[in-house]
UniProtKB/Swiss-Prot annotation:
SMART domains in UniProt: Transket_pyr
Keywords: Chloroplast, Metal-binding, Oxidoreductase, Plastid, Potassium, Pyruvate, Thiamine pyrophosphate
Annotated protein name in UniProt: Pyruvate dehydrogenase E1 component subunit beta
Functional note: The pyruvate dehydrogenase complex catalyzes the overall conversion of pyruvate to acetyl-CoA and CO(2). It contains multiple copies of three enzymatic components: pyruvate dehydrogenase (E1), dihydrolipoamide acetyltransferase (E2) and lipoamide dehydrogenase (E3).
Membrane among keywords: no
Length: 335
């Protein structure tokens, strides 16, 4: 068992899968000689060469399309988008080809590929590089969406994604690459469609994913000291949702709060809230609550940037309100 940064866990996953299966190839901007913007592919060009680690121009539409073709004809591409905001330039390829080709070809072509890279709000990266776009891709037929949040699940999930026969959007958070954690040295896989029960509780079900997992954990620590008992679930799979795990928790707590970094309009939480109401209405004591980011571009300056992201104090107050139904008590904590 080694302690690794999250980016190192991703690197290890890719390395192991490239060594195991010669059809796995890497495609993307600056992934070869440079080793990737966040060093996830560092060292792989030297080990596997230019035919398996392919540097591309800054042309997302073209290299995602090339990867779809490669996947349909027998390879297993792992594509790095330097920033998820600019993967939008390849949206037509993702929607019309990556997601739907298997169905539109009557099953003649499969598209076993992974499109991965950083998303979320970083530290003063500016509006264009601070977008949360997972909900943009949720409506693409045939596309799975997976998020990682720890070095342990990053490695296990990415290995599973590479071995899957489905096209997968694998979202990493820019602020989690330097997160440290224990990662087994052995070959292990984690299920792509399974949520993680982070903390058992009985008062309310808190659903979250990616970076907000850690803000939720900090909020729960404060509330536990005050006598509250929230249950915390890391969704991991954003499409499809693990409704079995979610439902089991709701049957116990009867209250729900969804915490996300997406914007409040059209976010992941809107779809999840609807599914919860449709499937578990009779188990709910109140409507599921949503805590999302405001509908504004992310400012560059630090204090304003922070104001556009859900903070720990927001989560504390929302959980308390969800449990008691009363306005939260005044607190001085800001994070």
């Amino acid at each position: 068992m080694a302690v690794r940064f999250l980016f190192e866990a991703l690197q290890k996953a890719i390395d192991e899968e490239m060594e195991r299966e010669k059809r796995v190839v890497l495609i993307g901007e600056d992934i070869g000689h440079y080793g990737g913007s966040y060093k996830v592919t560092q060292g792989l060009y030297g080990k596997y060469g230019k035919h398996r680690v392919i540097d591309t121009p800054i042309a997302e539409y073209s290299f995602v399309g090339a990867a779809v073709g490669a996947a349909a004809t027998g390879l297993i591409p792992v594509v790095e988008g330097m920033n998820m905001a600019f993967i939008l330039l390849a949206y037509s390829q993702i929607s019309n080809n990556m997601g739907m080709l298997c169905a539109t070809s009557g099953g003649h072509f499969q598209v076993p590929m992974v499109l991965r890279g950083p998303g979320g709000i970083g530290k003063q990266l500016g509006a264009e590089h601070s977008q949360r776009l997972e909900s943009y891709f949720q409506s693409v037929p045939g596309l799975q969406i997976v998020t990682c949040s720890t070095p342990y699940n990053a490695k296990g999930l990415l290995k599973s994604a590479i071995r899957s026969k489905n096209p997968i959007l694998f979202i990493e958070h820019v602020l989690l690459y330097n997160l440290k954690g224990e990662v087994p040295d052995n070959d292990y896989l984690l299920p792509l469609e399974k949520a993680e029960l982070v903390r058992e509780g009985s008062d309310i079900t808190v659903l979250t994913y990616s970076r907000q997992r850690y803000n939720v954990i900090q909020a729960v620590k404060v509330l536990v000291e005050e006598g509250y008992d929230p249950e915390v679930i890391d969704l991991i799979s954003l499409k499809p949702f693990d409704m079995e795990t979610i439902g089991k928790s709701i049957q116990k707590t009867h209250k729900v709060l969804i915490v996300e970094e997406c914007m409040m309009t059209g976010g992941i939480s809107n779809v999840l809230q609807s599914l919860i109401i449709d499937n578990f209405f009779d188990a709910l004591d109140a409507a599921p609550l949503i805590l999302s980011s405001p509908n504004v571009p992310t400012p560059y300056t630090g204090p304003l940037e922070e104001a556009t992201v859900v903070q720990t104090i927001d989560i504390i107050e929302s959980i308390e309100y969800g449990i008691t139904g009363k306005p939260p008590k005044p607190r001085t904590a800001k994070k």
